[in-house]
């Protein structure tokens, strides 16, 4: 049954489709060069000719924090309600990235923009979280970047997010946080050494007539170069209008200030909705393999907010007067790769036969509870997902991030018990679309609810489901004879409105397997394929 909220969501998607797909088509025709297909047809940044085309990590990889350690680069991103979370990625050329492990293996809350640090031979990950009691910052540490990582330690600084670690000229460690604040750390980095200080830095303010989401000073990231400390931060809001987010720069000869703003602020900003990347911001700067300099940040792809904020790489240079200048323009075309890097495979296959464990790094449970790890096991050559909740909305589905504008997915499912399960595109509890099966019927989810009027009697335990997503239009098929013959679902869903500007949450529309009710679903042969634009 349609509700007022469901109608509004549907209308939002329809309006978005008319306006955004037109802009996206214009951008495709005008500036988007063809991407290079990588593993499984996924788009790949490395074009194979000495150039790359953004994004470097496609799909929902927001708030990048990056660290150079010799010839190696490591990066991680906000993981929100995903568990496992805080997946660490590795590269040797800044363009080709591979996931190597997860720093968080149990749910701790909603994980936002982190800071990855190496100090005195030990790795630290400072983690802002949102929990029932509010926001705060935790820290985990490890002697090896690949783990194991420690249990989280609460720094007990409520209301703080977006940590940026720096070692001051006084030899003390500090975390700069949102809102122009900072706190001194103990020498071991596992506790604070004093109160949160107000007014440690003053965010740069844009002109009043600029079209942004809100002021929202956040994401301080610091580095020391020569006699200067540099502080990058974001203002303008991370979503909202395409021209919202931006990168600003300040510097000081002391970690204690005073800080002076770059006369060329903002050094990165989306200035028009016609650009290929919207709301660019939340940057970190890193030295390249050959000594040149690069900036990583996130942005929404024009017309595809459903993919989330994707990781982007832009060359920068130091000016004669000691400021940073961005060199990539609107990122509308291929750029020369960093010099001197070692080519490495960019591989994150999403396909999974589920023949045995452990669970691949592409998978995570959404909004998992403390006991949800026990819902997933491997048995008889299948992944077994125990039912939870009553529907797709409240069952904590098993999801993976996708980064292609067009793709197809196929999975084989066996339904056991009194529940139901299936395949979905899942944003959150309020925004999702999918089809599911019990042993007696097929169920349809759209615009965040099950449409009972579309229930269809269907006695089966084994089903193959096939999903095609072409530019946010979904087509479903199902087969009950092992994939020999297929039946197309009567509803082709348009989902361009299932994103942060409608629902909040900052995440993306992910492919998900779900199991609801008093039963379990056995999954085999999950296959993913990116489709050409």
Model-identified regions with their sequence ranges:
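Carbohydrate-active catalytic/glycan-binding domains of CAZyme proteins
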Residues: 1-2, 6-20, 25-533
